[in-house]
């Protein structure tokens, strides 16, 4: 997952998961003098929400004596998320969908700018299984394999991503953060009420309560599915976006496609 000379961009949001991840990687990195941990965050531009989360992220970085690197939607795409939501013409495409596409692009951009070898994200077990089930329910099971590409098989133009907390439950992450009194922002995003993920989360929480071990068992099934997909002769062909030159499976990458739809 990591090498002893890695330059690691740690994606933090100010929330509990990424705060715990940064703290753990910082402790580990102290034993590897040739490696470097660089906290990075994306400012989506959500009025009344992101500024408070950024305060928590800055507080943690000061505590760990690390410099936080920030990249905003506004500077990269010309719009904040609030402005994107106001300009969207298709209400069926939720704010979280826009945010997901643009956050992934922004994280890749800032990691490339910092010449990072890898991006570490704070996805925990609950997050991962919610995503797995959402992809299955949407009829896009192939995305499970595409979003969990082994580091040594990353597509050129994409900084490899790792999920060190993928087997740790949200409950345990919270316990770690509270035990060490780590600063984090725990107010939900104002756009979260639009998220399809909420229904999936509620279902999985109920299943884990009734059938303990459901989440970890589903992770193992997901890993088996990923292995099967990757043994298939079918390959995902990437070209370059005609507009921004980013890796893309089609003429226009999803980020540019969405920017065109809102009038950019």
Where are these regions (language model features)?
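ATP-dependent adenylation/nucleotidyltransferase module used to activate substrates
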Residues: 1-146, 166-180, 253
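Histidine kinase transmitter module recognition
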Residues: 28-31, 206-210, 244
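Residue-level detector of flexible, active-site-proximal loop/helix-junction positions
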Residues: 46, 75-77, 151, 191, ...
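Catalytic subdomain that performs nucleotidyl-dependent activation
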Residues: 92, 101, 126-209, 214-220
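C-terminal-of-GTPase-core extension/linker across diverse P-loop GTPases
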Residues: 219-227
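Short, flexible, mixed-charge glycine/proline-rich loop motifs
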Residues: 226-237, 243-248
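Short cysteine-rich clusters marking metal-coordination/redox-active sites
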Residues: 240-244, 253-256
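Short Cys/His-rich micro-motifs in 6-15 aa windows
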Residues: 256-264
């Amino acid at each position: 997952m990591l090498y002893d000379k890695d330059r690691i961009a740690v994606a933090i949001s100010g929330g509990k998961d990424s705060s715990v991840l940064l703290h753990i990687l910082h402790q580990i990195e102290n034993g590897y003098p040739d490696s470097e941990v660089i906290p990075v965050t994306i400012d989506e531009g959500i009025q009344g929400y992101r500024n408070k989360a950024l305060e928590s992220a800055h507080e943690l970085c000061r505590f760990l004596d690390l410099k936080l690197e920030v990249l905003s939607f506004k500077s990269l795409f010309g719009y904040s998320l609030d402005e994107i939501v106001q300009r969207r013409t298709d209400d069926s495409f939720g704010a979280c969908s826009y945010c997901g596409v643009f956050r992934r692009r922004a994280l890749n951009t800032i990691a490339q700018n910092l010449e990072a070898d890898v991006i570490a994200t704070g996805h925990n077990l609950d997050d991962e299984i919610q995503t797995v089930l959402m992809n299955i329910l949407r009829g896009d099971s192939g995305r499970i394999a595409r979003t969990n590409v082994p580091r040594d098989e990353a597509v050129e133009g994409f900084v490899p991503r790792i999920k060190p907390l993928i087997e740790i439950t949200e409950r345990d992450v919270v316990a770690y953060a509270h035990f060490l009194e780590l600063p984090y922002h725990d107010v939900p995003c104002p756009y979260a009420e639009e998220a399809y993920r909420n229904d999936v989360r509620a279902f999985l929480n109920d299943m884990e309560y009734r059938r303990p071990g459901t989440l970890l068992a589903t992770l193992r099934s997901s890993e088996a599915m990923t292995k099967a997909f990757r043994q298939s002769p079918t390959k995902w062909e990437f070209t370059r976006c005609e507009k921004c030159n980013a890796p893309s499976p089609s003429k226009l990458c999803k980020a540019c496609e969405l920017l065109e739809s809102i009038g950019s």
